[in-house]
Amino acid sequence: MVSKALLRLVSAVNRRRMKLLLGIALLAYVASVWGNFVNMRSIQENGELKIESKIEEMVEPLREKIRDLEKSFTQKYPPVKFLSEKDRKRILITGGAGFVGSHLTDKLMMDGHEVTVVDNFFTGRKRNVEHWIGHENFELINHDVVEPLYIEVDQIYHLASPASPPNYMYNPIKTLKTNTIGTLNMLGLAKRVGARLLLASTSEVYGDPEVHPQSEDYWGHVNPIGPRACYDEGKRVAETMCYAYMKQEGVEVRVARIFNTFGPRMHMNDGRVVSNFILQALQGEPLTVYGSGSQTRAFQYVSDLVNGLVALMNSNVSSPVNLGNPEEHTILEFAQLIKNLVGSGSEIQFLSEAQDDPQKRKPDIKKAKLMLGWEPVVPLEEGLNKAIHYFRKELEYQANNQYIPKPKPARIKKGRTRHN
């Protein structure tokens, strides 16, 4: 706590020092201009120059310097709604610099709340939230949730966790720790400060389902020792912890079971089907489909998910709620759709079917409709066009920085991937 206070003090001193130096520099410049002005006046009296034109010539560079300084030191933020002290909440988002977390940050900031983002940048990126840095309602903390955090908040959105196969398979122990120890720490924080906690769980708790579509009362069909178990079982344990704290300690909890989500700020090479297909299509490479492509998925756009998370947090629903799009497509249909939207000549390449790849996944969202008044509203093609536009820009950015990412498959066994 002392070291954090010292850092804030040093930061404040540095800001004051910078302002002082800028002030001195401007005063020196004005003094120089004034000296030239006096000299020019003397020259004019001798009939050698017209002072009016020279004043304008000298003042214009000063105006330019002031404009440049304003651009450098005045950060323009997205529009933020004003909330009274009574209505404004102090909100913590773990994993807030990640794909979904950064969009949730945008939503809550623009709604007028005070938002603290905690991220260890294992998969999150500072770029995703840098447009809020410096805003009085925003704070970014580099912190791993497996370590305790001491902060006063009203709500906690616990999103911290690797969520794509390459990331959680690369470090399964870290994934387990984040979903168990990290969740335990956030529940402890919620208990201490009386905050409400929302756990970002997953449709993976249903495993390879034997019931279709999947409703919240389905217990699932999960392989507890498979290659994905670190994530699937980690989330199942996290849910158990939430309800244990609710029953024993009276902590208010909300649990969102999130289905496949896509949109801007996804990692380009995270191994998910959306990012893989878009990247392959944009680069003119074959779109890789594992198995026959008859497996089904239902994809929701990220803004729909964010609205669902906020609605759930502010509701009285303490039991798990599915958040997903019930519009179902086969993987093959999805590959063809992305190919057409990109306008790509890429072929579709069929590879061996992956281990533990669910054959069907579709959420039953009756509960979300009835109890939250929520359902997805962004059409699939509209969302995909936004994602494609983002990926085009990312490719340009990477090209300018001499790096072109390649689609990264999730390693399961013998180099195989699965559709996510």
From Swiss-Prot:
> What is the membrane topology here?
Single-pass type II membrane protein
Q: Does the keyword Membrane apply?
A: yes
Q: Where does NAD(+) bind?
A: 98-100, 119-120, 122-124, 144-145, 159, 161, 178, 200, 231, 235, 261, 267, 272
Q: Name one GO biological process term.
A: D-xylose metabolic process
Q: Which domain of life is it from?
A: Eukaryota
List the keywords (alphabetical). Answer: Acetylation, Decarboxylase, Glycoprotein, Golgi apparatus, Lyase, Membrane, NAD, Phosphoprotein, Signal-anchor, Transmembrane, Transmembrane helix
Subcellular location(s) per record: Golgi apparatus, Golgi stack membrane
Could you tell me which residues carry N-acetylmethionine? M1
- Which named protein is this? UDP-glucuronic acid decarboxylase 1
